[in-house]
């Protein structure tokens, strides 16, 4: 197996050892299968995974649509992490990204539950309550505008591509149908009808 030399390090110490200035490691390492020799120091795998993520991010950034509302590749990584957590249905990723891009451009709050859950940390018990949506944390996109301060998950290639190449859509809302897919709406009235149909 690996030589686990980073085991005693805190997250911040690990990032410092890797020469990174980020405060959180979430999302900075590309999820993939990495081959290594027995006894390889784990720091090398972290470095390889980080380099793989940065290479992908920078390639997508150089090829991006100039109209995207991201100030830098890290903001696109944050968006990709939200898309990753928001759906397990691959066909919906581009549309969900398109909705969030539209909301950012319109100055609307993202209002996405996975960011609230991430901000709750260990307080999350499997269900979000109304009070949780009103309790402000740096990650609560119901109480704060814009993107959260860091990624909330490790996005895969499909979520990264969705963040950089979102669907062109007029939709501003979506709701889970219960079968893993989402229903998209252009107006709040349409969205409320969809919520009545699929949730209530």
Show the residue positions of the predicted features:
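Bacterial extracytoplasmic/cell-wall-associated proteins, especially those involved in peptidoglycan
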Residues: 2-9, 15-200
